[in-house]
Amino acid sequence: MSQTENAVTSSSGAKRAYRKGNPLSDAEKQRLSVARKRASFKEVKVFLEPKYKAMLMQMCHEDGLTQAEVLTALIKSEAQKRCM
């Protein structure tokens, strides 16, 4: 069998069906992501003065960390100072 015949016969078959079921919508993906986070972490909502929020964002940018990671490090540091 020549290569051209192989190419025609191999690509002429039906495509495989999507095996994982229907893809999730963006809203469903977000909901599942939040549910996973809630299972492992606690949510903290705070209101900061704009200058402190800017400081936090600057720390995040300089260190390449998320706000959660920077706040966790700050809390750990303060807890060590207080011998907790």
From Swiss-Prot:
Record flagged with keyword RNA-binding: no
Keyword Flavoprotein: no
Record region (Disordered): 1-31
Protein keywords: DNA-binding, Plasmid, Plasmid copy control, Repressor, Transcription, Transcription regulation
InterPro entries: RepA2
GO molecular function: DNA binding
GO terms (BP aspect): plasmid maintenance
One Pfam family, short name: RepB-RCR_reg
Bias-annotated ranges (Polar residues): 1-13
Function: This protein is involved in the determination of copy number in gene replication. It binds to the repA promoter thus inhibiting the synthesis of the mRNA for the initiator protein RepA.
Protein name as catalogued: Replication regulatory protein repA2
Organism name: Escherichia coli
